Amino acid sequence: MAFRDSTRDFNRSRPEKRHASRSSSPRSFRPSNQNARANYNLPRVRDAMKEEERSRETKEMQEREFLRLQQLRRAIIRLKNDRSKPIDKLLVSVYLMPGPEWEENGEKNSIDFGTVDMFDPLSVIQSYKAEDLEEISRNIGDIQQLETNQCRLTYWKYVKMLVNSRMEHNKVGQFSRGLKVVAGEVQRILAPKSFEQLEQLEAQIQKKLKSNVPLDTDYWVDLLNSLKSYKAIAYLKKTFNEELQIRKNKLDNEEWDKAFSDAKKLSNMKDREEKLYIVPIDPKPILRAQAIPRRIQPEEQADYEKELNDHVNIVKSSTYIPISIPTQKQKPTLPKNSNLINEDEFSIANRARLEREYLQSDDAEEQEMLGDYVEGQTRVVNENGVTLKKPHYFNRVLLGFEWNSYNQAHFNEAHPPPKAVQGYRFNVFYPDLIGTGRAPTYRIERTRRKNKSDTTDLQDDVCIIRFIAGEPYQDIAFSIVDKDWDYSAKRDHGFKSSFDNGVLSLHFRFKKLHHRR
């Protein structure tokens, strides 16, 4: 039997290893298809990232513009409604400046300023107290973050500079140690200078402080700080005085025209006999002491006069003061019968008298009737388009415990039920009806028929009581509990219906339901 040489077969089966010669050149690297595609798409990715960045910046800019215009719109609304914040006048005034340098992309076309006019920024800042100045300084920081217009940014820079200067003045006094002696001289030198002259002087002082020349550093530093305040004042005068003077001249011409027109009307008017009201003098003012809020503190005469003089000086130094114009066009109203006392004074005098009566009666169950006036239930204009007057009123609601079957079952005298309405006292004022022989009336209006047999319902029905006087007054309506009235003439708490000296009085209580206990 023949055997093969296994070693030879093994060696023959092994693959022959080939070694590359050292002298042979290495292979050249060829990138894969994936790397080639990545290198090819890299410019596209960069362009997409740049486009995304531009889109993000555009959105942020649009958002800032939206928030900035919303700030302006809210300020205009508050000014129209006479509830403005300290920053509002400064904000609206800068947007009313004419010229393309103060406007971007026609933004003023989207803003309705209405009757809001420009204010003198210097007068506005001088009229505010320390706490108002602090609020203005905080608000300016928020505005500067949203602002993009360079002219308005410069404006806010100097407004904030002046506000901070006044705040510092209120804290440590107008001048520090170095300037107390020469305060008048500093004001005499800096006040007349223009904005450009103050800029030159500021540069000279800064150069002097940086030099090695011996000098009184405290004096020059304090002078530099004072110069910033005068520089801000000079900038605001330079920026606004021309436009404010134009508006002032226009207002002067309008007032002259109106004065001539009024004088012509007065010359054509005939003398008319005026009817005067007889208002009794308050005999016992001390009885109103309980109605005066305790938080009201007396003011010293000297402090009051100083504050008044400060306001007078601010008005005198103002270039232009806008006139407060109503936001809505005033409709014609009927003439009053008297020029001696108006509706408000008549109402105040009679409210004081009624308050004294209620204090003397010591009825703890009475409260002022609030929130029961029914809107939209009356005609406010007559056939000729003349606005009717809404009468003033002073109403009281009478409260007390009601021991019906439900309350007897769930409450006792130690733990009483909630107080329920037991009656009303209506006092409506009609001063123009004095001496006319006319008296107002009232009527009850129900939306559904009253069910007299239902005495167990826990929810009281309501109805409307309407007071009618005719022209020049509107009807006036109130929502009241619909229960049967007690017409008995009891002293103090009985039924009363009268019209005396221009006051309609309607006092009544509800009938009581008696239950055995």
UniProtKB/Swiss-Prot annotation:
Q: What are the start and end residues of every segment in region (Disordered)?
A: 1-59
Q: Which GO terms describe its biological process?
A: alternative mRNA splicing, via spliceosome; mRNA cis splicing, via spliceosome
Its domain of life? Eukaryota
User: Basic and acidic residues compositional bias: what residue ranges?
Assistant: 1-14, 44-59
Q: Name one Pfam family in it.
A: CactinC_cactus
Q: GO CC terms on record?
A: catalytic step 2 spliceosome; cytoplasm; spliceosomal complex
Q: Where is the composition biased (Low complexity)?
A: 22-32
Explain the consequences of disrupting this gene: Leads to abnormal splicing of introns featuring long spacing between the branchpoint and 3'-splice site. Sensitive to cold and thermal stress; simultaneous knockout of tls1 exacerbates the growth defect at both higher and lower temperature.
Q: InterPro entries, from UniProt?
A: Cactin_C (IPR019134), Cactin_central (IPR018816)
Described purpose of this protein according to its UniProt entry? Plays a role in pre-mRNA splicing by facilitating excision of introns featuring long spacing between the branchpoint and 3'-splice site (ss). Recruited to the spliceosome by sde2, which may enable folding of the RNA between the BP and 3'-ss to guide the splice site towards the spliceosome's catalytic center. Assists the splicing of several components involved in chromatin organization.
The entry describes its oligomerization and partners as: Interacts with sde2. Interacts with cdc5.
Family according to the record: Belongs to the CACTIN family.
- Name-wise, this protein is Splicing factor cactin
Q: What is the lineage of its organism?
A: Eukaryota, Fungi, Dikarya, Ascomycota, Taphrinomycotina
- What is the name of the gene encoding this protein? cay1
